[in-house]
Amino acid sequence: YRVADTGMFLQVVDRADLTGNYSETSGSAMVAYALMKGARLGMLPPEYGEKGSRVLDGIRDTYLKKGEQGWELHGICASAGLGPGPDNRTDRTGTPEYYLSEKQMVDNQHGAAACMMAVSEQLRRA
């Protein structure tokens, strides 16, 4: 399900046909981390480490941008989940339309944290 031009995964992974679907940073970073760590621990074949590294490279090439105040990480879904959540929302339905309606953020902590985890695994591969 990787997107050919970014090497990342879509917000709604299996629905490339959806208008507004985009390469999403936090989920892609978690997949990259899992692939690299799994390969390092011998739980996955070694070539999966390289696949994870390519996903992380795609994040860097697509969404890591130099801003006025330094580097910024773009393309992070603000938050998506099921059920009402802490703010008692009723729109968290789990439909593709719901997932695509959540706004994209810059430097959101769950996206940045997932990227830092993936980068730490990529550095261990070096």
Q: Can you describe what each PLM-predicted range is?
A:
Residues 27:
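Anionic-ligand binding region
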Residues 23, 40-126:
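CBM-like carbohydrate-recognition segments
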Residues 1-16, 20:
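Oxyanion-binding "anion nests"
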